[in-house]
Amino acid sequence: MALDPNYEDFQRLSLRFAGTLGASDPFGAARAAVDFGHRYSQKRDTLPQTDEDRAFHLVARATELIDYQLPFATDASAPQTIAEARKLLSEALELDPECHDARRMLSAAQAPTPNEYHRFLVEGAQEVLESCGRRRDAVTGSDELADVARTLAMRPYLRWLAAECASSLICGRYRLTLQEGEEALAVEPEDPADVSLTLALTYAKLEDEEGLRALCERADERRGPAWYALARAALAFKREDRDEARAHIARLLALYPNAGTTLARQDDLPDGVFARLAIDPGTEDELILATSEATVLLQEGCDSHERGTFGWWVANLPEVTQAQARELAADPSLGEGQK
């Protein structure tokens, strides 16, 4: 799932390197491929690259700090991690003023409110589209490598739209979320940014069962089944069909490790800044991420328990509490930091 900056960095440099090779010597190309792998991992600076490539590499390094190290940093080390990431992103913009990933990530860190960040994304989208479009149109050739290069040229715009879509959901602009999600799917129908997962939550928020059904007919539900199950459970709960809602929660308990603990805790995690966090499918982390993004559904309509009515109902289902008890008995560390 999700867009991995390290893999994209590898793709960018491999395309640049491939452009230096002759097509008439397959054995030489094979040797060159081995040489590229070694140089990429050991001597990256010796590979042919542009300032645009160097800037994206800095973005990939900043992503590792912000999205994957900062959430686990101590209070003492967090400021240094943040400062280092901002420095990398600023350097990326110096190398490539049209490094839109860096510009977006800096804004995410600096915007005083979610609404301010949302406004930044909405106002900047057209400029990013035009910039990425120019780079796409500058790619020559009609072979497979050229097609990949054109796709990569549009990826910053795709990530911009995906961030805009997620931001609209957070800010309660649900119709705009649907519009932005469809725009992202038009850029890449294969949906590498997994905007369909955001759309599933949005349809549940709007209580639009037909919209969710239509989405599921064209989306691959094997990519992120937790999002679809939570959306369907929320819809069933809203129409007071508790049996169907419980069936969807039961599916989560069967699909994911430590699902009882995850559904009981309902931790709210920081969003990935580069893109939705890259996690392995079917893992505990996938359900944790889905539950966090489904906060808009779980915390809707706070009751006397200071928790959303749907979220409280899920956390207190007998099958959830029983599963959590079994999981804690097997691994007491799961209870650390319990709310």
Language-model features: where?
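TPR-repeat structural position
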Residues: 82, 115-118, 174-175, 209, ...
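Extreme N-terminal leader/anchor segments
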Residues: 1-94, 249-252, 326-339
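Structural motif corresponding to the intra-repeat A-B loop/turn of tetratricopeptide repeats
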Residues: 68, 79, 113-115, 171, ...
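TPR alpha-solenoid repeat register
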Residues: 102, 160, 193-195, 228, ...
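Solenoid-like repeat scaffolds
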Residues: 47, 90-95, 130, 150, ...
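Long, ordered, amphipathic alpha-helical scaffolds
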Residues: 50, 234-339
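Residue-level signature for tetratricopeptide repeat
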Residues: 64, 75, 109, 150, ...
